[in-house]
């Protein structure tokens, strides 16, 4: 496959109308933060000559998000349609999809002691597992400052003792977490969803909003995607 044939699709986090997707102090709104990271990742990948699409860029709902379900279910269905239409147009073997989010331990408007980075795939063995492995490699490389931050934060009581910088499940031989998430289960190409620390942990939020944190999160996505393309698509 030629580099010019590769189709990268990036996913933004939930709409602004979806309640509870922010830090307790409102300093971080997942919908805004995700779109900022997506924009930075998209620009960098395009500078390397790749074709990049975003599943949904506006903060608010579209009239095309039709149906009888909840707004969130209609939103997810819309995103999957966008991805699968591009897969049908260009060929799913030429496509990959990475949806970028920020995790939360609760939806109660309170700070919590959870932290860490992780990457989700659908259940079973697919090429998404290989994409997730590349994302984990990039996260380990780019989040060294966060590893030190969590270690210090655990001593100060900002994280519970069981927290680790990288959330993983090695029971099936790789690091990704498998879950029945709609956008990774229903899309036709290799697809992963990253949860980039926790929006309801004070230390995580401070890191995410710092220049160091923002650049690390963007850079790990760029590197993970490029590594996957080099290893499995070109």
Where are these regions (language model features)?
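Extracellular/periplasmic catalytic domains that process cell-envelope and extracellular macromolecules
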Residues: 1-3, 46-47, 89-92, 111-113, ...
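Active-site histidine-acidic residue metal-binding/catalytic motifs
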Residues: 1-82, 103-108, 113-115
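Active-site-adjacent mobile loop/cap segments within catalytic or ligand-binding domains
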Residues: 6-9, 15, 19-20, 86, ...
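Structural recognition of the beta-strand scaffold that forms the well-ordered cores
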Residues: 7-11, 51-56, 91, 95-100, ...
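Solvent-exposed loop/turn segments at secondary-structure junctions
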Residues: 15-17, 58-62, 102-108, 124-127, ...
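Solvent-exposed, polar/charged alpha-helical surfaces in well-ordered, non-transmembrane soluble domains
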Residues: 31-39, 43-47, 81, 85, ...
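Mature extracellular/periplasmic domains of secretome proteins
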Residues: 73-93, 128, 181-186
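Acidic, glycine-rich loop-and-strand cores that form catalytic or ligand-binding grooves
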Residues: 127-163
């Amino acid at each position: 496959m030629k580099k010019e044939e590769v189709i990268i699709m990036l996913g933004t986090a939930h709409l602004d109308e979806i309640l509870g997707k922010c830090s307790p102090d409102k300093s971080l709104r997942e919908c805004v933060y995700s779109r900022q990271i997506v924009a930075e990742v998209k620009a960098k990948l395009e500078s390397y000559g790749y074709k990049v699409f975003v599943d949904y860029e506006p903060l608010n709902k579209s009239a095309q998000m039709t149906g009888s379900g909840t707004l969130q279910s209609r939103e997810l269905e819309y995103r999957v349609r966008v991805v699968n239409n591009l897969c049908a147009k260009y060929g799913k073997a030429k496509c990959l999809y990475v949806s970028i989010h920020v995790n939360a331990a609760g939806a109660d408007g309170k700070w919590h002691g959870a932290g860490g980075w992780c990457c989700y795939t659908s259940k079973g063995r697919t090429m998404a597992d290989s994409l997730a492995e590349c994302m984990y490699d990039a996260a380990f490389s780019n989040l060294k400052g966060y590893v030190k931050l969590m270690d210090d934060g655990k001593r100060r009581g900002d994280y519970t003792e069981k927290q680790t910088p990288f959330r993983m499940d090695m029971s099936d031989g790789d690091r990704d977490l498998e879950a029945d998430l709609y956008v990774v289960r229903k899309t036709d190409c290799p697809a992963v969803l990253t949860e980039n620390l926790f929006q309801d942990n004070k230390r995580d939020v401070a890191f995410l909003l710092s220049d160091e944190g923002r650049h690390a999160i963007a850079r790990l996505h760029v590197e993970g995607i490029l590594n996957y393309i080099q290893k499995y698509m070109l």
